[in-house]
Amino acid sequence: KTVDPEERRFGFTMPGLIALISQAWFRKQRIRGKAVADVLARLMVRAHALGSQNPLAAFYGRPEPLEAYFDATKNLPVATPLRRKDCSPICDGAAAVILTSRPQAVRIAGLGSATETASILDRAQLTCLDATRHAARIAYWRAGIAKPRELEGLVVELHDAFNSLLPIGLVDLGLAD
């Protein structure tokens, strides 16, 4: 139910929403044609490589080679520019736990969260996710971080149900151009 009910009534889907955001973002970045598929293919390989190492991941033990992205019989189009391997499988669940002993304790310096509309018509910009930007500003402010790109050892986890959201998220977090 993340798609606006009125837009859903006209056939809009989450992959369709992400596809439009991705198209706009790639256009803004001046990435066109086969270069878009090349970027998405590399992101797919990265995602599957990481997931293949996690025993709790849907694709545990199943990394994908670059050629798999371009296999038209197994990686069908979903919503341009997204193909099947750009989309996560339907699955639920997430958790984050930090366990440590006192001598090795780490301090979580900042945390931020935000929400925004899923409606394509109500978005201020199509090339970013405002909630990510807002949550990052809150977390950086709470942590006293003025220049996140200059931090060493920064750990970031982004929700990337669609491969194309990773570069968009890194830009929205202020970690990439």
Language model region names:
Residues 120-124, 157-177:
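Short glycine/threonine-rich loop-to-helix capping motif typified by GTGT followed
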Residues 2-8, 28, 33, 41-46, ...:
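Condensing-enzyme catalytic core mediating Claisen C-C bond formation in acyl metabolism
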Residues 2-81:
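Glycine-rich, mobile lid/loop segments that gate access to catalytic sites or pores
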Residues 17, 35, 39, 131-135, ...:
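Generic recognition of stable, solvent-exposed alpha-helical segments in well-folded globular domains
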Residues 111-114, 152-163:
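A short beta-alpha structural unit
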Residues 96, 131, 135-146, 164-173:
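Stable alpha-helical structural segments in soluble proteins, enriched in small hydrophobic residues
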Residues 31-39, 147-152, 177:
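Short, surface-exposed acidic
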Residues 5, 9-13, 134-152:
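Long, hydrophobic N-terminal alpha-helical segment
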